[in-house]
Curated annotation (Swiss-Prot):
This is Globin CTT-Z. One of its GO terms (cellular component) is hemoglobin complex. InterPro entries: Erythrocruorin, Globin, Globin-like_sf, Globin/Proto, Mb-like_M. There are at least 12 different components in Midge globin. One of its GO terms (molecular function) is heme binding. Belongs to the globin family. Residues 18-162 form the Globin domain. Keywords: Heme, Iron, Metal-binding, Oxygen transport, Signal, Transport.
Amino acid sequence: MKFFAVLALCIVGAIAHPLTSDEAALVKSSWAQVKHNEVDILYTVFKAYPDIQARFPQFAGKDLDTIKTSGQFATHATRIVSFLSELIALSGSESNLSAIYGLISKMGTDHKNRGITQTQFNKFRTALVSYISSNVAWGDNVAAAWTHALDNVYTAVFQIVTA
């Protein structure tokens, strides 16, 4: 029990530097421009990193261009993007930190149980940022806001994945 209390404190500490309202606004406005492209986002991740696709039993070993048009692919892409949308919607308000922690904690635990590594999380991040930056107005301010947001999330997730 003590372990979980310490882990919770570490995770809360990792997100103790929440986004400013300006950073949150930049992340939210850029995300709003792409969040309805769920299939394209997941396709971009799988195309860039086939080893991530291989981690999904329902997609492993299948032709990406073929599965991209399937309902199963669209459903899973929507799950991933909806999770990100929920985190982003909560960002920018310190009063939402416990809700953000709860979401990150569950996602981290679920992915730890599936054997997902820090390397795979980082690959996902790279592909996600590549997709967003290629599809929205992307300046240094937007890049910095996304870096801050993802650093917060990934620091917390890595504390869970490596625990």
